[in-house]
């Protein structure tokens, strides 16, 4: 599922599914809304998906940097990727998954943000913030996430 759509009774649909999940693509840094307003709206959506089943939900897709389809599609400012991921977990998610891991070589999503860009560099900000910095935060709370220290170092 993705955001709110009129005509869909999410709680009725929740009775038919095993796990609630959604794709989260907030429009950070848009001129008509503060970062705080975007965060509050996103928090409400996380709470909606948690409450659908009364248990943790899966965040199936989120962008580590920007999208290729929103009216305003700016690179996330430093710290926003971490804020967004930690907010997701704080509101009951069992996962924070990114679309896409590696930038597409062609087609419609070639210019959609990715953890690893077209140049494959590990020193790019989306890679550092979504894998290394965020992993450091998660490693404090989730022992199973310690695998990330093998990639980013201690």
Language model region names:
Residues 14-18, 22-154:
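Carbohydrate-binding surfaces of carbohydrate-active enzymes
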């Amino acid at each position: 599922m993705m955001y709110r759509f009129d005509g869909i009774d999410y709680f009725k649909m929740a009775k038919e599914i095993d796990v609630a999940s959604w794709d989260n693509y907030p429009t950070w840094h848009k001129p008509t809304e503060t970062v705080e307003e975007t965060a509050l709206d996103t928090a409400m959506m996380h709470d909606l998906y948690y409450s659908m089943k009364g248990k943790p939900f899966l965040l199936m897709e989120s962008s580590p940097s920007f999208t290729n389809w929103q009216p305003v599609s700016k690179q996330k400012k430093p710290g926003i990727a971490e804020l967004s991921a930690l907010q997701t977990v704080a509101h009951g998610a069992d996962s924070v998954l990114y679309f896409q891991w590696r930038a597409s070589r062609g087609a419609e999503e070639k210019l959609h943000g990715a953890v690893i860009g077209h140049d494959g560099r590990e020193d790019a900000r989306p890679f550092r913030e979504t894998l290394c910095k965020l992993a450091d935060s998660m490693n404090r709370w989730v022992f199973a996430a310690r695998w990330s220290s093998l990639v980013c170092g201690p």
